[in-house]
């Protein structure tokens, strides 16, 4: 009997080799985006140096794909160097073989704190266009340079470090060490004798030994098998479904440039001249008070005779309470 080999092994090998070749081809492709950043209004802020104005700024590439339903997706980001230039890499999937972009991509400038900077020349000035191609490497760039104002797009904060002079030398006393004294001669003493404790006296009579207490072993136990009580079957466990949270979709903030309004001059209002009108009040009616009737006369009491006073004269009372 003859066993024929299967023909499926060769197809699997060819598929594996094709996958390796596609991965190597995709890794060899390199897509770079280069550009420069320009400062506007530098003469107004003379305290900021040009290398410090670019420190901390970042450039992000936002692309508008067809399957993203009109939303922008971040494809790459990079920092701006001291000369105002930047270069970063983006995925090669969004670039065709002829160098054309499959998606509409734009460059956005961000401050050192991650806030987006306003675009001065509009959105079309920051659009990514094809520049050159050498082999599998594509070089993309911008239509115009990105412009920003240091007043709106804030860079890193640098402290001004003045050159302080060195402190004066310290006037310290000379370093001296204490004198080492010679050791005294040893003093020999006789050893301390500790007296031994006396032993207890010996017992003269002989001890009387009694027979030991007998030890009875317990009887051999008889083991019986335990009564098996059948358990009721438990109900089947109900596994709760595990709901995974949805994948968050981060939307980049829409940059709305602020509208400039003309200055408003507030009108100056003056208080009008007050017009005082006289207020006429009715006269107060005074009701005369009726006279009170005359009080009756106080009856006359004869003076009380006291043979002798019990107390002396009282001191005079004050007139005020």
Swiss-Prot record:
Expression tissues? Mostly expressed in aerial organs, particularly in expanding leaves, stems, flowers, and siliques.
- According to the record, the signal peptide region is 1-26
Alphabetical GO CC annotations of the entry are:
extracellular region
Presence of the UniProt keyword Cell cycle in the record: no
sequence repeats mapped onto the chain: 168-172, 173-176, 177-181, 185-189, 190-194, 198-202, 207-211, 212-217, 218-223, 225-229, 234-238, 240-244, 245-251, 252-256, 262-266, 267-271, 272-276, 277-281, 282-286, 288-292, 293-297, 298-302, 303-307, 315-319
Main subcellular location: secreted
- Output one GO BP term: plant-type cell wall organization
The alphabetical list of record keywords is: Cell wall, Repeat, Secreted, Signal
Where is it located? Secreted, Cell wall
Q: Locate the region 24 X 5 AA approximate repeats.
A: 168-319
What the record says about family reads: Belongs to the plant proline-rich protein superfamily.
What this protein is called in its record is Proline-rich protein 2
State the encoding gene: PRP2
